[in-house]
From Swiss-Prot:
HAMAP family: UPF0235. It comes from Citrobacter koseri (strain ATCC BAA-895 / CDC 4225-83 / SGSC4696). GO terms for cellular component: cytoplasm. It comes from the Bacteria. Belongs to the UPF0235 family. SUPFAM superfamilies: YggU-like. InterPro entries: DUF167, YggU-like_sf. This is UPF0235 protein CKO_04329. PANTHER family: UPF0235 PROTEIN C15ORF40.
């Protein structure tokens, strides 16, 4: 499975998360996953909620349309974006 997989109602992203980074950003490819740096610490679900909010802004969707399918407690996550309104250029480059 690749880092970005189109599905019937959106995109499935395989992510590697770097918490406590200096800024929020989509870094690029990290092995067979997309590396995402977020500023939130990995404590009490703060990193997950921050990740959902960040991805919602990047894809221009509501937070409820960003679903963490796998990896709730780890750095390696599988996230589904339902009906993205826009694709960030870092992700668009990986779908070609």
């Amino acid at each position: 499975m690749s880092a970005v997989t189109p599905c019937a109602d959106g995109l499935i992203l395989r992510l590697y998360i770097q918490p406590k980074a200096s800024r929020d950003s989509i870094v690029g490819l990290h092995g067979d996953e997309v590396k995402v740096a977020i500023t939130a610490p990995p404590v009490d679900g703060q990193a997950n909620s921050h990740l959902v909010k960040f991805l919602g802004k990047q894809f221009r969707v509501a937070k409820s349309q960003v679903v963490i399918e796998k990896g709730e407690l780890g750095r390696h996550k599988q996230v589904k974006i339902i009906h993205p309104q826009q694709i960030p250029p870092e992700i668009a480059a990986l779908t070609d």
